[in-house]
Amino acid sequence: MPWHPVSFFLCFFVFVPQRLYLYTHKILYTMKYYFYSLIVIALLLTASVSIHASKKLKGEASCRTTNTETILHVWCWSFNTIRENMKSIADAGFTMVQTSPANHCFIGDGGGKQIMGNGKWYYHYQPLDWTIGNYQMGTRDEFIAMCAEAKKYGVRVIVDVLPNHTAFDTSAVAQGLRDAVGGIDNLYHANGLVEIKDYNDRLQCTTSGVGGLPDVNTENPDFQYYYMQYVADLIRCGAGGFRYDTAKHIGLPSDPLDPKSKKNDFWPVAMGMKSVKGFRLENRDQLFIYGEVLQDRNVKEKEYSKYMGLTASNYGHEIRQIISKRKATSAEVADWQHSVSATKLTTWVESHDTYCNANESATLTDTQIRLGWVIITARQNGTPLFFSRPDGSTRENFWGNNLIGPKGNDEFRNPEVVAVNKFRKEMDGEKEYIGTAADGSVVAIGRGDKGMAIVNLSQQEVALSIATKMADGTYTDAVHGTVFTAADGILTATLAPETSYVIK
């Protein structure tokens, strides 16, 4: 029977759309169900990964980025002493040496060379001129000879430089420096002879005197040019990098201006980003440079990091707390406590300042310092610095033989120090994971499935049982001959008190 026009209209425009709607609605509902199901599954999977993956901490680098260098701070060693011990330094696995300041400095106590007493270690932190050579460290020729010896062993020389201030005795400042900057008044900031009262006030912090030391007008182009000639000479003589003392006391472009300054451009000039009077630092990317930017309130860490690496002072304090209380959590060990990428941090257990100023770290034993060193050096990032304590020093006699010039004690070549230095280089490219014993007495730093460094912080023997990624089997520590067994993701061994181990 032929379709009536009305029937055709009702079927095509009413019933068919209804059926299509019902089918379409059903399809959309089904798709919606599967869509939300997929979201739930994805969330569950993500949660599972988060539980098992290491938490990304502030300052952490990407998993394939590693630092392999190590620095020996040859504190108060003369250039000749460093040269004579270069083979031992290289054999100990150190890739860099950091010297004390090489510039002409204040001569106090009649030229005495005791670290503290008839002479002072901090006199070489009081410049009178920016030329190479001083009575404590040695001559320019001796510096050149030291650098040549370092090159022979593949060791980079880092020089401690300090453009921020001069000696207290401004009358002793070299005439050549005075003339270069247009007179002594042009050498200092407007309030450069006034001591800082509030270290968190950036104008005071960067233009007044640290501890009362006269604050140099580092924005004066004449000074910048003079200082950069010193840097260039150090490089010509063989230096491969610098540690900038009191770096946070030199202003950044965003800091308030001193009345004598037109712009805060010291760091762009010092890092070769900008020329001064026709001079520009070349090959900046071939130099290792970091600044002493001690952490505190209102310190512009990220802005400083645009120019150089930075010190991880808070992390150093945390490590000293760990070795003092002899307990740690993996979170305490892992957190760099810094806003800057860990690849740009210089780390330490102690520095010359923590040792000398109020002797904050000087009461820690050499063994405790060594245990802390193994922890920071086994890690994937940061560039660790080992402070060479005075030879003959004890926890009752911090200055030991008390002489500027001779080498420090032999801890830098302790077998445990050597083992972890070499482990660090061998683990290049291996991602770290950190574990601790249930009671916190043991810290383990794993690097991929290639090796582990284990530290027993306690003063008792410990039966170790800790997670590992190493393949099943037995591993023998090269220093102590201790046998470790890995089975089903668990590493076991018996650890001696206050001892570190490296297995691979």
Predicted ranges, named:
Residues 5-24:
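Hydrophobic alpha-helical signal peptides and transmembrane signal-/tail-anchor segments
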Residues 26, 31-35:
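Positively charged n-region of N-terminal signal peptides that target proteins for export
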Residues 50-52:
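Sec/Tat signal peptide C-region and signal peptidase I cleavage site
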Residues 54-70, 83-90, 101-125, 144-159, ...:
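Active-site-proximal helices and loops of the catalytic beta/alpha 8
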